[in-house]
Swiss-Prot record:
This is Small ribosomal subunit protein uS14c. The gene is rps14. HAMAP family: Ribosomal_uS14_1. It is found in: Plastid, Chloroplast. InterPro entries: Ribosomal_uS14, Ribosomal_uS14_bac/plastid, Ribosomal_uS14_CS.
């Protein structure tokens, strides 16, 4: 189980990303549309003004049940070992064990 502070920090980053998403997207469109390099540099400076944690690259997918940041399956929102336990216990409909 991940520490609660790490999970809360990740939620805070998600809220910041949602808040500044439209601003970042509009600035990126402006950069792609402007032909002059000096104007692009000015807009790029504006792009750096929002908080660092509002960037989407800083987000991590976390396991829904344990909060583990690694080995997450996007389809289920679970980490690998929790997914395996739930499949073995038949708690995930449609998921089957494979062996070859």
């Amino acid at each position: 189980m991940a520490r609660k502070s790490l999970i809360q920090r990740e939620r805070k980053r998600q809220k910041l990303e949602q808040k500044y998403h439209l601003i970042r997207r509009s600035l990126k469109k402006e950069i792609s549309k402007t032909p002059s390099l000096s104007d692009k540099w000015k807009i790029h400076g504006k792009l750096q003004s929002p908080p660092r944690n509002s960037a989407p690259i800083r987000l991590h997918r976390r396991c829904f049940s344990t909060g583990r940041p690694r080995a997450n399956y996007r389809d289920f929102g679970l980490s690998g070992h929790v997914l395996r336990e739930m499949v073995h216990a038949c708690l995930l409909p449609g998921a089957t064990r494979s062996s070859w």
